[in-house]
Amino acid sequence: MRTPTERIDELRSWLDGKTHVYIDYANVRAKCEKKDWMLDVYKTWRTFNSLGNVSAIKFYFGKILGNRKSEGFHALLRKIGFEVITKPVKLMKLSIDVSGIPKDSPSIIKTFVEPCLLRKLTVEAIENLNGELRKMNNSGLKYVEMMKCNFDVEIAADMLLDNELHAVDTFCLWTGDSDFAGPILRLLNEKKRVIVFSDGIAPELDDLRPDGLRVYDIKKLKDLIGYEKQKGLSLESPSAKIVGSCDQS
């Protein structure tokens, strides 16, 4: 395992020239949580700011209007030094009311289950799931709320605009979503360096490796910019747990 100093040196070797960082926080947080760790925003900003050649660290995350915790987190991000790009989170009501459908119908379940998995479910499994939903309905629960706030368009637009206006050499993108294949290829074709920070990328991005796309495994930064989710304690400083998770509930 490399020391923090060695990791910093490694980052410097990857992020060459004038660099802009684009953090899709919802995407990063979801991936980190699956590995039982969380991003410490203090240490993230401090780490990349210390490299000397990072001129912008852009943080994309939705805000729940009127929610003190959400609005406070955004204020904190700005105070730390991030360039925060946000918009209101949309709360979508998804029906779980199975009262009007056959017990073996997947019409409600398919809203929450990927098609590839849905096709594998047996009739018995679907009936059991609908049975659980019916119990929820009987207790008065007819819908669930899902928060939605996607920044793919904003991030892609900012990357291309920064390329035109700010002569950026290296683009550090913290998301591995397929929607970025087009913008990334455009930057690569203009001889720019693009590095995706993620522990997994879409096949569309993986196909761009021969064109010059590089992928940095974000798990390697866990000890440098993270803290353990299950303990709620920073790997380096206890104060990090106050700001890292941003549970906007």
Language model regions located:
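Domain-level signal for Mg2+-assisted phosphodiester chemistry and nucleotide/NA-binding surfaces
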Residues: M1-N128, V144, L188-A202
